From Swiss-Prot:
Pfam families for this protein: Zn_ribbon_8
Protein name as annotated: Uncharacterized 5.1 kDa protein in Gp39-comCA intergenic region
InterPro entries associated with the record: Regulatory_FmdB_Zinc_ribbon
Entry-linked NCBIfam families: CxxC_CxxC_SSSS
Organism in which the protein naturally occurs: Enterobacteria phage T4 (Bacteriophage T4)
Length: 45
């Protein structure tokens, strides 16, 4: 499974973190710090 980068959408938090997810997984997640919405970042490798 690939490793994706996520960023919290809360202005107070804005934490970036990595998470292993299935390719067919959703583009959103939950911030591990504040438990608010996080979105998958687009990266060029």
């Amino acid at each position: 499974m690939p490793l994706y980068d996520y960023k919290c959408q809360s202005k107070d938090c804005a934490k970036e973190y990595e998470k292993i997810k299935k390719i067919s997984g959703r583009d959103t997640g939950v911030c591990p710090d504040c438990h608010r919405l996080a979105v998958r970042l687009v990266s060029a490798s």
